[in-house]
């Protein structure tokens, strides 16, 4: 892979509280080294910015935080070359039906800005999409988008992905490329997943 291979490309990464620090660091450094611009996005709930905190899955583990000042409702996914849903429970949080604290309804399942953003990206085959680990949860409100797509995911998400009509492919590599959609089993597979995304962009 050549230096600055993604010069001029733009990457949108949807994330939330409970993000995995080394995953987001990998994107920030990896895409920047290749020349791409990286934008992290989350629900800002009307604020100018929000501080989100990392996942903690063991006693005594250090908690990290990051400030995010971009809301997917203010951006067009068609302005990006790559759109990624970060791992862990970020996708669950991003599915919250606005306004925060509302009871919502079945008719509003697709209204969260991050869901709309990722769905719109899925409708554009020129954009390379990626969902790592639990990331495909962002699309379960849109089964018509997942129907028939070949994917891999963490087994925690498998029932939901199956019920949404996706085709589960338990590939030994832990990475599945289905045309413009790249998925991987878990954050442990970040190296192969990242390479698959870049290679898909480069054609």
Residue ranges: model-predicted function:
Residues 154:
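Active-site-adjacent substrate-recognition loops and nearby beta-strands
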Residues 131-135:
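Short, thiol/selenol-centered motifs that function as redox-active sites or metal-ligating centers
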Residues 1-124, 137-147, 158-203:
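Extended, subdomain-level signal for the structured scaffold at the beginning of enzyme domains
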């Amino acid at each position: 892979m050549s230096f600055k291979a993604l010069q001029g490309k733009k990457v949108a990464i949807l994330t939330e509280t409970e993000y995995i620090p080394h995953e987001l660091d990998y994107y920030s450094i990896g895409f920047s080294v290749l020349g791409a611009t990286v934008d992290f996005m989350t629900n800002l709930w009307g604020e100018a910015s929000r501080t989100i905190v990392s996942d903690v899955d063991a006693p005594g583990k250090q908690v990290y935080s990051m400030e995010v000042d971009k809301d997917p409702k203010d951006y067009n996914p068609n302005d990006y070359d790559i759109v990624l849903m970060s791992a862990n429970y970020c996708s669950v949080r991003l599915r919250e039906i606005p306004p925060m604290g509302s009871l919502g309804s079945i008719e509003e399942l697709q209204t969260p800005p991050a869901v709309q953003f990722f769905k719109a990206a899925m409708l554009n085959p020129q954009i390379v999409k990626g969902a790592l680990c639990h990331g495909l949860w962002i699309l379960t409100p849109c089964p018509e988008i997942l129907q028939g797509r070949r994917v891999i995911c963490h087994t925690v998400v498998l029932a939901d992905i199956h019920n949404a009509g996706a085709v589960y492919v338990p590939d030994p590599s832990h990475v599945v490329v289905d045309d413009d959609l790249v998925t991987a089993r878990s954050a442990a597979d970040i190296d192969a997943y990242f390479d698959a995304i870049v290679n898909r962009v480069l054609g």
